[in-house]
Amino acid sequence: LGLMEVHFVAAAWQAVEPSDIAVCFREAGFGGGPNATITTALKSEGEEEEEEEEEEEEEEGEGEEEEEEDGEEEEEAGEGEELGEEEEVEEEGDVDTVEEEEEEEEESSSEGLEAEDWAQGVVEAGGSFGGYGAQEEAQCPTLHFLEGEEDSESDSEEEEEDDDEDEDDEDDEEEDDEVPVPSFGEAMAYFAMVKRYLTSSPIDDRVQSHILHLEHDLVHVTRKNHARQAGARGLGHQS
């Protein structure tokens, strides 16, 4: 590529449409369509991803079989534990019946005392609750006023945060509108990457001519997009 062509590529690199580049690839014979005359032994990324997914599914299936075997062993162990627990429950049942009889005797002897203590406790509790209610009514206006102040402060803080977020969003939109221009080195690195990918397998003169044709089309696309971008910027300055 000449310096002038690379200059156009560097100036309009971000404005190149992916669909235009795809058309250039297909016209140059690199597309895998029905009329394609060039084939490579390289696997596509989609095929590699599918193979990896199949391997992961096989590994997951083996892991599930191992989990099922472990579950069967746990069930057998659980059955043995249940038998032991049933025997323990029967022994505990005999002890519980004796304890229940002793508790019934103690409850019957203490029913009279509990009735008197309960009546006295109700009287004492009523007096204390009555004093607390009067004190709370006296403090209610102050409490409600403080709650109102806290609500107003929290509302004002939320409004300030919303305003700050709106300003940040506007700044981000303005930054997105600006298209960064790559350097000369970045443009050369891109074309070197494309060439390395296309020439990764043995090629003949016919394939080499296709690569040169592809580079010519890419330069043409970048020139067209550069002119389009320059015209849009000119209209923006006039407005």
From Swiss-Prot:
User: What is the annotated localization of this protein?
Assistant: Nucleus; Chromosome, Centromere
Q: Name one GO cellular component term.
A: nucleus
Tell me which residues bear Phosphothreonine: T37, T39
Ranges of Acidic residues composition bias in the record:
46-117, 148-179
Region of interest called Disordered, as start-end residue ranges on this chain: 28-185
- The principal location of this protein is nucleus
Q: Where is this region: Homodimerization?
A: 176-239
Note the InterPro entries from the entry: CenpB_C, Dimerisation_CENP-B_sf
Any idea which UniProt keywords this protein has? ADP-ribosylation, Centromere, Chromosome, DNA-binding, Methylation, Nucleus, Phosphoprotein
Post-translational modification comment from the UniProt entry = Poly-ADP-ribosylated by PARP1.
Q: What are the GO MF terms of this UniProt record?
A: chromatin binding; DNA binding
Listed under subunit, the entry gives: Antiparallel homodimer. Interacts with CENPT. Identified in a centromere complex containing histones H2A, H2B and H4, and at least CENPA, CENPB, CENPC, CENPT, CENPN, HJURP, SUPT16H, SSRP1 and RSF1.
Q: What does this protein do?
A: Interacts with centromeric heterochromatin in chromosomes and binds to a specific 17 bp subset of alphoid satellite DNA, called the CENP-B box. May organize arrays of centromere satellite DNA into a higher-order structure which then directs centromere formation and kinetochore assembly in mammalian chromosomes.
What is the official name of this protein in its record?
Major centromere autoantigen B
- In its UniProt entry, the species of origin is given as Ovis aries (Sheep)
The lineage is: Eukaryota, Metazoa, Chordata, Craniata, Vertebrata
